UniProtKB/Swiss-Prot annotation:
Protein name: Uracil-DNA glycosylase
DNA repair listed as a keyword: yes
GO cellular component terms, A-Z: cytoplasm
Name of the top EC class for this enzyme: hydrolase
Keywords assigned by UniProt, alphabetized: Cytoplasm, DNA damage, DNA repair, Hydrolase
Record function comment: Excises uracil residues from the DNA which can arise as a result of misincorporation of dUMP residues by DNA polymerase or due to deamination of cytosine.
Active site location: D59
EC number, UniProt record: 3.2.2.27
Pfam family, one: UDG
GO MF annotation list: uracil DNA N-glycosylase activity
Similarity comment: family membership: Belongs to the uracil-DNA glycosylase (UDG) superfamily. UNG family.
Top-rank taxon: Bacteria
Length: 216
């Protein structure tokens, strides 16, 4: 079932209509990231029936040219944000012979079935969490619940306390939930690097007859 069907009812709800109007109004008055056409990139690039992994972020990067609708990802040519750099360090720990990419665009992950979902989908330039209370989490909670209900054998990578608050939305009997500290430099040393989440994800997928993710 496509997103258009799964989320049609949600997008008609008053809260979502008001949320979208508020974002549109903000675009008239300030710079909002990501660009309008990229807000739903995570959903555009990863159909529900293809989802193997969900990586939850918080809200988009708030610097120029960084956010393009995929959690943790930046377009090619943009400097690696620290959390993303630490994610690739963790991949290198899990797969020591890996040659890491020179860019931080995770579109190839999305195309393989990794839903790179921020819980808040827009932000004002230079003002982290500025749209956090606008209603986005009601929408993305629904996305998480729909993924849990409509799929089987998906790995949910929940890094940091914000992402881990979403555990009640996920059916742990038919999915794999992996938790670790956030890859931010503030917390990564507390257990992110030795969580081995990238290898564990692929081990789980293969155990359930699914193609592993090519992380690089």
């Amino acid at each position: 079932m496509p997103w258009s069907t799964l989320l049609a009812e949600e997008k008609q709800k008053p809260y979502f209509q008001q949320l979208w109007q508020r974002v549109e109004q903000a675009r008239q008055e300030t710079v909002v990231y990501p660009p309008k056409e990229d807000v739903f990139n995570a959903l555009k690039l990863t159909d529900p029936e293809n989802i193997k992994v969900v990586i939850l972020g918080q809200d988009p990067y708030h610097g120029p040219g960084q956010a393009h609708g995929l959690s943790f990802s930046v377009p090619e040519g943009v400097k690696f944000p620290p959390s993303l750099r630490n994610m690739f360090k963790a991949i290198a720990i899990d797969y020591p012979d890996t040659v890491l990419p020179q860019h931080g665009d995770l579109t190839s992950w999305a195309e393989q079935g990794v839903l790179l979902l921020n819980t808040v989908l827009t932000v004002e330039q230079g003002n982290a969490h500025s749209h956090a209370s606008w209603g986005w989490e009601t929408f993305t909670d629904t996305v998480i619940s729909k993924v849990s209900d409509a799929t089987d054998h998906v790995v949910f990578l929940l890094w940091g306390s914000h992402a881990q608050k979403k555990i009640p939305l996920i059916d742990g009997n038919k999915h794999c939930i992996l938790t670790a500290p956030h890859p931010s430099p503030l917390s990564a040393h507390r257990g992110f690097f030795d969580a081995n989440h990238f290898r564990k994800t692929n081990d789980y997928l293969q155990q359930h007859g699914r193609q592993p993710i090519r992380w690089v």
